[in-house]
């Protein structure tokens, strides 16, 4: 049994034995570049995370995919572990090989509370991943209304010119559409790169509920595709 495997398997008592014995490299990486801390964060083993951090585990070491322990914690969604990593100086806006920050990972996993916590801690909401998507785009796509409300969607669009409103309409997120409409009306008649307005997309999708919301908000019913 290696120290790294004990951390990965959640064997707290064995981890304690290794640490008490001493001479352990708490930051030793495996072939994938993952550290004991990375695995403990990924699996949600908060007690082991605490032991490792108290033993000077490095919160900034990234694996071969440029994922840090905070990325791993974002995948497991454990808010307590995320808070602990932040307390020990984890980089909030580190990006993995896909350009995703821990915040984006949290939103993609629909972890609203933990995402709001990272935003409160100062996570950059304007970082775009390699696909051009920002935090607001993920929050919109997954219907995370609390996050949508706290983020500014002004002037935000993806690589195809789709605004958060386009995305909410495309995904049939009627409550998110309602939230975005109360936040700003600047996106209401904005076309994407294909010339499609949110209303056109709603009609193409046959979503009468969303179409009515847009029309009631003042969407231009005469705007046509170019």
Task: Locate predicted features.
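N-terminal segments that cap or nucleate solenoid repeat domains
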Residues: 1-35, 160-190
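Ankyrin-repeat-protein effector appendages
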Residues: 2, 121, 130-133, 137-171, ...
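Ankyrin repeat A-helix N-terminal signature
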Residues: 5-10, 39-45, 72-78, 105-111, ...
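Ankyrin repeat domain, specifically the short helix-to-loop turn at the C-terminus of the second helix
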Residues: 17-24, 50-58, 83-90, 116-124, ...
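A generic tandem-repeat structural signature
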Residues: 57-83, 87-91, 96-100, 104-108
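Ankyrin-repeat and related helical/solenoid repeat scaffolds used for protein-protein interactions
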Residues: 93-127, 204
């Amino acid at each position: 049994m290696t120290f790294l495997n004990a951390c990965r398997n959640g064997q707290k008592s064995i981890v304690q034995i290794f640490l008490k014995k001493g001479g352990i490299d708490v930051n030793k990486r495996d072939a994938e570049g993952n550290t004991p801390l990375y695995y403990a964060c990924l699996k949600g083993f908060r007690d082991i995370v605490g032991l490792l951090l108290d033993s000077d585990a490095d919160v900034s070491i990234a694996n071969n995919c440029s994922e840090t322990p905070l990325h791993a914690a974002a995948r497991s969604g454990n808010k307590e572990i995320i808070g602990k990593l932040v307390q020990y100086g984890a980089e909030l806006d580190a990006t993995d090989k896909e350009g995703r920050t821990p915040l984006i990972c949290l939103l993609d996993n629909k972890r609203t509370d933990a995402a709001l916590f990272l935003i409160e801690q100062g996570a950059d909401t304007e970082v775009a991943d390699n696909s051009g998507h920002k935090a607001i785009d993920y929050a919109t796509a997954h219907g995370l209304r609390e996050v949508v409300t706290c983020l500014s969607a002004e002037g935000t669009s993806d690589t195809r010119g789709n605004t958060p409103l386009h995305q909410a309409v495309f995904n049939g997120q009627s409550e998110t559409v309602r939230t975005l409409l109360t936040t700003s009306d600047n996106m209401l008649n904005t076309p994407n790169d294909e010339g499609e307005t949110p209303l056109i997309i709603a009609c193409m999708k046959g979503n009468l509920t969303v179409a009515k919301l847009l029309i009631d908000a003042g969407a231009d019913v005469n705007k046509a595709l170019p």
